[in-house]
Amino acid sequence: MLKLGKVETYIHEKLEREKLHFVLLDPDDVSPELAGELASMSEEVGVDAIMVGGSTGAEGEVLDSVVRAIKESSNLPVILFPGSHGGISKYADAIFFMSLLNSRNPFFITGAQALGAFQVKRYGIEPIPMAYLIIEPGETVGWVGDAKPIPRHKPKIAAAYALAGQYLGMRLVYLEAGSGAPQPVPPEMIGLVKRVIDVPLIVGGGIRTEEQARAAVKAGADIIVTGTAIEKAGSVEKAREKLEELNRGVKG
């Protein structure tokens, strides 16, 4: 019988009480030392989990050392957010086992997943099946993943894909505008998607301010992902201020 793993159970239990804030760290952009520092700070501020990964696909020792540093510095769950099948580290707690549903390339829909599946099993990492949708502009991830980004003014297309993902058995839906996107996913799109699906909705990309985080949550997002705004804050003090600001937007 299929039963939910520890991290997925943690997500569902926390969602019964509040909206969640995940911080995404890209091993291409942060050293293990900085990753550890940001993770420990995230935990103090009230962030709920750390995601590790990026579209250009850091792997091997670079990825492992960042995941290890995070595990040593905080008690937050570490969830892999792989750009491809190389983005797997045995030190992580869970992996968003995701399919880029609006890719034009079957490699990003099921190919990379097949190549990584046995490794996930061998390492005993908890897989969390997720439908991943790229919304305009899509940024680097849209280009790398050969996506056909969903137009910002077509929420119904996003909702159709999201519902298809749920019906295919995926237990989370992620709307992604792309790291560093000029604007986040539009609230109208978040709202429509949330109305049609029954699984938790994650929204990320372009969320830089308390107001943007609050607007996404108000529209229906269950989990907000931030990353670039924190990584690019300029100093550790500024990163903490930005984290606190974004967390206020999510938690209210």
From Swiss-Prot:
Organism: Thermococcus kodakarensis (strain ATCC BAA-918 / JCM 12380 / KOD1)
Pathway recorded for this protein: Membrane lipid metabolism; glycerophospholipid metabolism
Subunit record text: Homotetramer. Homohexamer.
GO MF, any single term: phosphoglycerol geranylgeranyltransferase activity
Name of the top EC class for this enzyme: transferase
Taxonomy, superkingdom: Archaea
The protein's Enzyme Commission number: 2.5.1.41
InterPro entries: GGGP/HepGP_synthase_sf (IPR038597), GGGP_HepGP_synthase (IPR008205), GGGP_synth (IPR010946), IGPS_HisA/HisF (IPR050064)
Binding site for Mg(2+): 26, 55
Pfam families the record matches: PcrB
Residues the record lists as binding sn-glycerol 1-phosphate: 174-180, 205-206, 227-228
Reported cofactor(s): Mg(2+)
Keyword hit for Metal-binding: yes
Family: Belongs to the GGGP/HepGP synthase family. Group II subfamily.
Assigned keywords, A-Z: Cytoplasm, Lipid biosynthesis, Lipid metabolism, Magnesium, Metal-binding, Phospholipid biosynthesis, Phospholipid metabolism, Transferase
Name under which the protein is recorded: Geranylgeranylglyceryl phosphate synthase
Catalytic activity reported: sn-glycerol 1-phosphate + (2E,6E,10E)-geranylgeranyl diphosphate = sn-3-O-(geranylgeranyl)glycerol 1-phosphate + diphosphate
Disulfides per UniProt: none
Cell compartment(s), UniProt: Cytoplasm
